Amino acid sequence: MIQYSLTSRALADEARMETPWGTGPSAVAEAPQASVKPAGRPGPKVLLTSVCRPLGAAHGDAPSVGYEVLHGQVTRAQGIFSPRSVNYTYGLDYIAANLDAPAVVLQYPSHRELIRELKKGPDYVGISFNLVLFHRMKEVVALVRKHAPRAQIVLGGYGTVLDDATLAPYGDHICRGEGVAFFRALLDEPPRPMPYDHPLVMLNLKVFSIPMDRTGVIFAGLGCPNGCDFCCTSHYFKRRHIRLLPTGDDIFRVVERYLEVDLRMSLAILDEDFLLAKDRARRMRELVLERGTPLSIFAFASVKALSRYTPQELLETGVDGVWVGYEGKRSGYSKQQGKPIEKLIPELRAHGITVLSSMMLGFEYHTPEIIREELAEFLALRPTYPQFLIYGPTPGTPFYERIMQEGRMRPEMAADPERYYRNCDGFTSMVVHPAMQPGEIEALQGECFATDFRLNGPSIVRSVEVWFQGWKRYHHSDSPYLRAKAQRWGEEIQFAFPVFRVARRSGPTPEAASRLEAEIRAALGPPPMGARVRSFLAPAAAAWTGFTLRHNLLQHPKLVRRAYRSTRWALRSGQLGSLRVELERALHSTLVRVEGVWDRASAKRLAAGIRAHLYHNDADVKVLVAEGTHAASRYLELLARELKPLRHRVSISVLTGPATGEYLMSA
């Protein structure tokens, strides 16, 4: 923290020039419980919730349903080596952060925890669900109607691909498309321009039950123009791409916000094909190189988009991990145009870029022999993380329309829609295939996961291998940024050393793990003391992880509850004693206009409200002091002290008139 003091004259000088209160790093303020008291009645109360836990096959859900994409759909066959990270319903926090009304977000509540919140009397309850969780949505609706009967129910999420007739019995409103605009209109709040306020959402990654990394989630866009015939997210938004963060500058502002929390934090950009928008990516690269801090960004991409960049350009954009679709050799999607994927994936790996790639089973041309041939070619590319999904129809997609027209839905699924919904998880064959039975396709899927793990070993070891490739290529680079990136890779490799001891003892490819460890030791030297201690403890941690997996212990997350503007002092327009406060959100800033008489109480409450506002988004705040506003210098100094940790994001300007000008001169 940069230490500084602000005299009243310095504050007045900065106010005249409309400049931020200083520069430099800052700590993130805790969300306070006080702000500007609203005028009149408070707005309606909003509760946004996911479906309830427990989830999983043991609780009546489809095979891959749970809380984790990696463990459930990618590294599901890797046992103790599977990285663990809970994926939340991120859109709920994003919507809540961009309303004016008080809002509470619940992530994976139990029935009891949800009931406790419902008894507080929300006016609206939003429920987010996917198609595969339709039955879970019905459970939540029943609880709402019993314990908050006056609340209006809003259904949202990709489960709303179903038609109105199917959903009408369960909701008063159906949110399809972009949720912030929908909810603001529903609550009769004025439209808000993009980019919206961006909440901080951070995920923890564990290996052998030990926290290893934190990832900040960046909401950059919705929808995808590629329009693959099976893709729900593309057709849900009518093949349109909605830029939640329109420019590279907007994205980088969020990046810097996360770096304030942790300079080494990993980042994930949620955008179906982030690199397809070259203007944003090019500007991001300029800003990343200008700052010089080596970043670790994971992004969704396509062969078409990746072919437009060199691996070095990707790294200089901060991207060192991508999710790209392999799909099938003859699937023929437009997004696969560009470099042959047989060259693309090895090239990315050789430059230190990890690759999560997805292969699909069940295309019309597939037979067991063709699937095994494609699997062998796919595994030869050594993707860091492999995913294998069954080609399936989702309402609203061209594939679904074709299957229904041809009458090829499995009869038991067609006869029981809720059974069909429950099995829309990518791990159940739902279509009558010309060459294979459903059970055969599902067995081949399991074979793919098992074969990958047996031949290529744990993905966490593959990650270290890719980082090492990047380190070897760039640790003597002419580029200062890439040298710094190589240094970060080296530190991450040494931090990950404990995985080798477990991989040698319990992994399917102990010889490969031993060779990689020896090569790394020869290049980087022995690991530091901390890594050696963790290596000694790693087998015990891995054994504990195996025990919890075998006995289904500690496999469910705890409730995550976040409240937005839930106190009577939430920052909003209103009367604060004799000080009138008016808020106006501009494109990149929130304007706070104050007028009247400023005293100690109003200064403290205004500062608390500004801190709360900035804690939940990446905007700036500009305080406009109206002409004729009366304030003693000590109250302006108090405001400055209260906002010290965030001074680089706050500015104050004074609409100077005779009385105000006299005050500033005397200050």
Name every feature range the model reports, one short phrase each:
Residues M1-V69, Q107, E117-K120, R150, ...:
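Radical SAM enzyme core and accessory elements
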Residues I2-R264:
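Acidic, low-complexity intrinsically disordered segments
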Residues L55-A58, D163-A165, D279, L361-E369, ...:
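Flexible glycine/acidic-rich beta-alpha junction loops that bind and position SAM and/or redox cofactors
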Residues K146-Q152, L295, V319, G352-I353, ...:
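A short helix->loop->beta-strand "cap" motif at the edges of active sites that frequently abuts
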Residues V154-T160, I269-F274, A626-E627:
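Glycine-rich beta-strand-to-loop/alpha-helix junction loops that act as flexible
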Residues T166-F183, P311-V324, E373-F388, P645, ...:
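Structural recognition of alpha->loop->beta junctions
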Residues V201-L356, L361-F363, E369-A376:
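Radical SAM [4Fe-4S] cluster-binding motif and immediate context
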Residues R600-S666:
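Amphipathic alpha-helical interaction surfaces in cytosolic regulatory modules
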